[in-house]
Amino acid sequence: MYAIIRDRGMQYRVEPGQVLTIDLLKAEPGSQIELGEVLLVGNGEQVKIGSPLVEGAVVRAEVLGEKKGEKIVVFRYRNKTRYRRRTGHRQRYTQIRISEIVA
């Protein structure tokens, strides 16, 4: 069984047991969360497509922890003026494990 979920503007294809990295959630590691915006549910031969969401469908997941992405360097430069600015950014993510899909 698989589902396509929407979480804060991003869509993910998920299956039970899958480890997924999403944008940062305010949740403690080890806690259970529900992702309620399910757009599609399928199990091989049968597919339910929502308009826009599948009624009564919920994806439950366990929060594994937080991690940071790779460092992105932003460099601003203006020629002939000795103007240089270098900053870095590391996006924070939450890792979750999909425990079940209820449709």
From Swiss-Prot:
Domain of life: Bacteria
InterPro entries registered for this protein in UniProt: bL21-like, bL21-like_sf, Ribosomal_bL21, Ribosomal_bL21_CS
Gene Ontology MF terms in the entry: rRNA binding; structural constituent of ribosome
GO BP terms: translation
Pfam families linked: Ribosomal_L21p
The UniProt record lists the keyword rRNA-binding: yes
Entry keyword Metal-binding: no
UniProt keyword list: Ribonucleoprotein, Ribosomal protein, RNA-binding, rRNA-binding
GO cellular component, one term: ribosome
Subunit structure: Part of the 50S ribosomal subunit. Contacts protein L20.
Protein family according to the UniProt entry: Belongs to the bacterial ribosomal protein bL21 family.
Stated role: This protein binds to 23S rRNA in the presence of protein L20.
Record protein name field: Large ribosomal subunit protein bL21
Native organism: Chloroflexus aggregans (strain MD-66 / DSM 9485)
Gene designation per UniProt: rplU
